[in-house]
Amino acid sequence: MPKRSIIEIENLSHTYLRGTPMEHVALKGTNLYVEEGECIAIIGHTGSGKSTLIQHFNGLMRPESGKVMIDGEDLSKKKVDLKTLRQKVGIVFQNPEDQIFEKIIGDDIAYGPFKLGLPLKEVRERVKWAMSVVGLDFEEMKDRQTFALSGGQKRKVALAGILALKPKILVLDEPTAGLDPRSRKELLDKIKRLNKEEKLTVVFVSHNMEEVAMLADRVYVMADGTDVLTGTPKEIFTDKEKLQRYQIGTPETVKVLYRLSDLGYQVKTDAFSIIEAADEVIKVLTGMKEGSQHVQRI
């Protein structure tokens, strides 16, 4: 059965402070399509329009021109049910403290479900589930005060508050910023599981190309307020000409393999995971040993 589009952005434009000396064109003719159940990464340099784009997904910004369709609903209409839309599309922003409203962790995560009018029992179940997804122990953390949390913990609480709404679309702006390596891996694994097992549609903005390679089914590259390139991680990160043209970063594993390839070694340059890249390096080292070659500096 073919998948259906759950997000359709066509020729979207947005200008901040139009008609003033501070006027700034943030989006110009941007296009983006997301199928239900996909995991999509949006990458690009600071100021390329990524954050402005995702704020159109749940009505925080309304389209000035162009089309924004979310789960079949046209957001350019005058009357849009924002409450329903924002239950359907959950956004976790880069600064999580802006999304924390309550003094106690459990109360903050329960805030959204209570606003939906859900009974106490269901709210409690949603809070427990959401906390488990982000790696917060319910009994240990539910009564802690939010002001005393680290930046990484606040990010987890903000994400749990969105997940407790059970959205159809999860939008993440730099999801692992402020997390230590272990917490980062755990959270990425859980996001991937939600996407693959729960069929949750995920759209995320990231400057971390390892995350992009690990999670994304497809990648959109933005520059100067518009989409300039789209493809799978393999298609994006193995096209050296476009990487250079748009100054796209690459996963560290790919950088190492490209360097080995430039030195004349036969390696796969599309090995994104550490394990795959390590296998390629081992092959090179084994060949050097058998041929009594010296390892060159890379």
Predicted regions and their residues:
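A short, flexible loop at the N-terminus of ABC-type nucleotide-binding domains that lies
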Residues: 2-6, 15-29, 78-81
